[in-house]
Amino acid sequence: MIKALIQGLSITLKHFFQKPITLRYPQQKRTPYARFRGVQRLEKDPEGRPKCVACNLCATVCPAQAIRIEPAEDEEHRKYPGVFVIDLGRCIFCGLCEQACPKEAIRMTEDYELAVYKKEDMLYDKEHLLR
């Protein structure tokens, strides 16, 4: 009985003096791993326009059906996304949208802070994704 008590206390004391594993979150932030998939971002070309040509491949390949694109054309008859919305409440962050894009217009970032107060704030539109 006493031997088991001493063993238990020795294990407790050993762990008591070790460095803590948990981070104090808002003050200390963990750096994501190299292959981490966070919130999506739309890329711009050198002229400042979105690289996206509204081909709908990302929306087609998305298993959660979280992407909605409505194509439009500019005065030079180039297609661009008139509406580009990602519902992060449905997104499973699989990265298939990034792999399917032929123009490398959509990228997964290292941003993982997604806390919002309203469900509508989980809908990221084109302007938000281009930041």
Q: Across the structure, where does each feature detected by a protein language model lie?
A:
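Non-ligating segments of multi-cofactor redox enzymes
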Residues: 1-79, 85, 89-90, 96-99, ...
